[in-house]
């Protein structure tokens, strides 16, 4: 065999394996290429692990989407709380009778002016149980039968005073705290914590990961401010009623 043919054969048998990118499911770890023990021959590695390539910018996109969802839920909850007992949906979560039927399956509620709710019971035989469910709900509301009508109840609402406005504002603040930082999975703090937990599995010395952590923190602060603005607007609306 010629010297040139021998060299070509040697090169073809000692080429190092290529690194490859494996698909990344939700939040896999960002791994560096690790070298194992070598066989002693130059250019040969026996135990090299492949590189997993992750677009860490997805964390920022995901954080923004989840924070935006939290903002929408917070705004909706504030609106519900702001109405207080005057909301036609106030009884929707009640369970009625021994069988625990949903209130909305047995009756519908509408607002009459600013000081009363009208409950229309679909079947007269359920009226008594509807009354019991409302009185047992701890809402301090007393439904009364409308004369000559077995299917409608009138629920008088307490007058709006400075004290009631302040009480509503206190409830609004509680909603804000829940969506700012709590065990609630939609809270800004919980969302941030879950994302940071995933980021800890990535390379801490990686510059891209560091940048993502900084970006997520920045976005979290921005949405906390937006949440505070929603609270201020809701409180202002209540106190100016």
Swiss-Prot record:
GO terms for molecular function: ribosomal large subunit binding. Pfam families: RRF. It comes from the Eukaryota. GO terms for cellular component: mitochondrion. GO terms for biological process: translation. Keywords: Mitochondrion, Protein biosynthesis, Transit peptide. It is found in: Mitochondrion. PANTHER family: MITOCHONDRIAL RIBOSOME RECYCLING FACTOR PSEUDO 1, RIBOSOME RECYCLING FACTOR. Belongs to the RRF family. Necessary for protein synthesis in mitochondria. Functions as a ribosome recycling factor in mitochondria. This is Ribosome-recycling factor, mitochondrial.
